[in-house]
Amino acid sequence: MRLRTALNEYKRARGTRFPEECPTQRGAFSGHGDRLVYVDPGGFIRDYSSSLSGLYGIDRSRFGIETQDRTIWFDDLNPVRQHYYRETNVVETEYDAGKFTVHQYDLTLGRAHLTHVELRGAIPADAHLTAFLTFAPGGRETRVGRLIHEDAGPDGSKAVEVFHRKEHDYVTASTGLTDVRGQIPERFEEILSDEYFEFPREAVLQRYEDTHLSGDVVVSAPLERTGRAARTTLVTQLSNHEEVSREEALADLRH
């Protein structure tokens, strides 16, 4: 875990019995090969893969359903249950959003991780998935690179690449990415403050490093509708470019 994330999590948990810890006993793990991903009952995912593969992947994340009026974050909803789906390593987390339910399925396959989100019920017409992700290639806090590949995702859609030296991490969605936004990480004075900062946040991006040299990214994906259900799958993939090329990694991501 990066220093920024660890300090912010400590501030959030201050006042609890063990604020310095990041407990995982409440959630579940999905792993395959040399990638291991923790799935929290609040929906966020985090990589615990560095000791297995030397690749750090996702340091923090947050998922939500965005409409024209608001964003419904999964960690603000009441989780109905979390369990391993039919005795597999698929983790299903279910939430009650009032007029509809949210079903999140997480599965790790090799160095790819799939987060499948399905809504059931009276779904808002303009609803789409929003995901905040912080990648930490090489365990880096800052000075990572970020590229947007306009036609590298499924059906010629976008894919995002975050990298530092040999580790290159990718994200796309089965229904394509319609929006990719940068995020300003915690500034030095914010790291020193006592205040907990919630991400993602609305802020004016003024400097080049805010949009290109940070592992923080917000992506949006449309939902594919079938009857009273709507769904999409977010795909993240870790790669070592001493083992595979960018072209090979993007080809794996598409398929």
Predicted regions and their residues:
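Terminal accessory carbohydrate-recognition/targeting modules of carbohydrate-active enzymes
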Residues: 1-255
